A protein has these predicted regions:
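Carbohydrate-associated surface elements
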Residues: 114
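A general alpha-helical scaffold signature found inside nucleotide-binding enzyme cores
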Residues: 53, 57-61, 139, 438, ...
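Active-site donor-binding loop signature of nucleotide-sugar glycosyltransferases
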Residues: 40-42, 111, 223, 367, ...
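N-terminal glycine/serine-rich phosphate-binding loop of ATP-dependent small-molecule kinases
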Residues: 1-108, 123, 154, 215, ...
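Gly/Ser-rich phosphate-binding catalytic loop and adjacent alpha/beta segment
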Residues: 117
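Active-site core segments that coordinate phosphate-bearing ligands/cofactors
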Residues: 2-8, 14-15, 81, 122-135, ...
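Short beta-strand-loop/turn "lid" adjacent to the catalytic site in phosphate-handling enzymes
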Residues: 74-111, 131-133, 166-187, 218-231
Length: 530
């Protein structure tokens, strides 16, 4: 069946993801291949000192993104979308959307970017003996309680952006377990909110005499593939005001961008992981069991089917590296050589592989902004060497490439060395891997693990949530999400894999020891360079 017939007969599946700067829709066929897409750019706004998106911006963004998809489908296939096999919604995780009994929002949506929750996160981490990050919904809620915000007593429902949109489209107050794990800790045995922590929280806030307890106001937790309701008539018109899109379509549990990223890179099985490396970076390793104790630099979330995931998030990755590459571009322009940025990156990155495995003693700190993992509230990009270090272009570029994943290594070394976590495969995606084979080899040395890069990983979260919508309707009886992805989606495609050599691993370890010893240099730069 060709694409036009697939669309017109309602066999296509739609995934929509709300990222922080772009809303993206992907339409896939029954074989899980993307056949069309649409997008819409949007921006958060700083209102009264807090980052937010208005409800109008959310619904306008959804309509515009879907209209762009419809237009592309019309142009490419001369077809109209009337009905779909299934729909999935995903969005950036965490943050705070609180509603009263009348379904009115009580304060403007507070996004994950807000860092006004330090006191709450700190107290809750101690109360639960579990690392609660600043951006989690429970940190936002507890900070509102500490700040004695009036609206708290009127809360009837608390959810994330994906949970809010799903609720409006279906009438169902539910959340996929991955997104839920960024609201409140999940017990990986029950695959639901941690009952002991729920009890502790309720007791801790009891003196406020709110009419609710925390379990009353959180969304119901659902696993991938579970029934999460259908698109209502109201919901269909919210997506497509033209009235073409029919209601009563199955909608899968809404998920967060971490979960859809795991799906898009086939990193759902225990002992697999994925790394995203661009302006910032993060790694997610799927664990066989919970960690022995909490670590401030490791966030615990889950896969969309409820396995525990250890996440290390770094604020800085490629920005400083890009600034150095731009310096070489300026030099080329100065001496009158035509500039092709892909060539500049390619030549410099590949030349880095000819450098010493320990970068000849050179160290770079790529801190454009602060870096919580290494305890810095602010950053100053810094390159440092001793007079007798081996200073040449290959070592210089290699040191800067190492720096781009250095903090990620420090966080993951805790997992691999202290917690003795084992990983069979890590899939990488993002701008760092655009030059074939270089960023991948550097990351393999950093994490002492084979690293795969897939062609499809660039499709990202909108494709990931479309795959979860496909799993809802197409899974076989008792077929796990990991098996479904292996058998129906990736079918043996692990992309190109690079395994590090012992010398590369040893070289990176030497570099990172020098890097850690030198951190006071970076702290001093922050103190004295304004």
């Amino acid at each position: 069946m060709n694409e036009k017939k697939i669309i017109e007969s309602g066999k296509a599946i739609l995934g929509i993801e709300f990222g922080s700067t772009r809303i993206k829709a992907v339409l896939i066929d029954p074989e899980n291949r993307p056949i069309s897409q649409g997008s819409f750019e949007w921006e958060n706004k700083l209102v009264d000192g807090l980052w937010t998106y208005s409800l109008d911006a959310i619904w306008n963004g959804l309509r515009e993104c879907y209209a762009n998809l419809r237009k592309n489908v019309k142009q490419t296939y001369d077809a109209e979308i009337e009905t779909l096999a299934a729909i999935g919604i995903s969005a950036m995780m965490h943050g705070y959307m609180a509603f009263n009994k009348k379904e009115e929002i009580l304060v403007p949506f507070r996004t994950w970017r807000n860092t006004n929750t330090a006191k709450a996160a700190n107290e809750l981490s101690k109360l639960f003996n579990f690392n609660i990050p600043l951006r989690w919904s429970i940190s936002h809620l507890y900070q509102c309680i500490l700040d004695k915000e009036e609206h708290v007593q009127n809360i009837d429902f608390l959810t994330t952006l994906a949970g809010y949109i799903h609720w409006q489209l279906t009438g169902v107050k539910a959340l996929g377990v991955g997104d839920a794990s960024g609201m409140f800790p999940i017990d990986s045995a029950t695959k639901d909110y941690d009952a002991a922590m729920i009890e502790k929280f309720n007791q801790h806030i009891a003196h406020n005499h709110f009419h609710w307890n925390i379990l009353d106001i959180l969304p119901k937790v659902l696993l991938a593939g579970e029934n999460a309701g259908v698109l209502t008539e109201k919901g269909a018109l919210l997506i497509d005001p033209s009235g073409h899109l029919k209601s009563e379509l199955p909608v899968c549990p809404p998920e967060g961008d971490a979960g859809t990223g795991m799906v898009a890179t086939n990193a759902i099985k225990q002992r697999t992981g994925n790394v995203s490396a661009g302006t910032s970076s993060f790694s997610m390793i799927v664990l066989e069991k919970q960690l022995s104790k909490p670590y401030e630099m490791i966030d615990m979330v889950t896969t969309p089917d409820g396995s525990p995931v250890a996440m290390v998030h770094c604020n800085n990755c490629t920005s400083d590296l890009n600034s150095w590459v731009n310096l070489f571009k300026e030099y080329q322009q100065l001496i009158g050589i035509k500039v092709d940025m892909n060539e500049v990156f390619g030549k410099l990155y590949n030349h880095a592989l000819e450098g010493d495995k320990d970068c000849g003693g050179l160290i770079a700190y790529n801190y454009i902004s602060g870096e919580p993992v290494t305890g810095l509230a602010e950053g100053r990009p810094l390159f440092v060497r001793s007079a007798n270090d081996k200073f040449n272009l290959a070592n210089f570029m290699r040191a800067n490439l190492y720096a781009s994943v250095g903090v990620l290594k420090i966080g993951n070394d805790i997992l691999f060395n202290e917690e003795k976590i084992h990983v069979d495969r890590i899939t990488a995606h993002g701008g760092l891997f655009k030059t074939k084979g270089v960023g991948q080899r550097i990351l393999a040395a950093a994490l002492n693990s084979p690293i795969s890069v897939m062609e499809t990983a660039g499709e990202g979260g909108a494709w990931g949530i479309a795959l979860l919508a496909g799993y809802l309707i197409n899974k076989a009886v008792n077929q796990s999400l990991a098996d479904y992805l292996d058998e129906k989606v990736f079918i043996g495609n692990i992309g190109t894999e690079i395994t590090p050599t012992a010398e590369e691993v040893e070289g990176f370890n030497t570099y990172i020891e020098n890097y850690k010893v030198g951190l006071p240099i970076e702290q001093t730069a922050v103190k004295f360079k304004k």
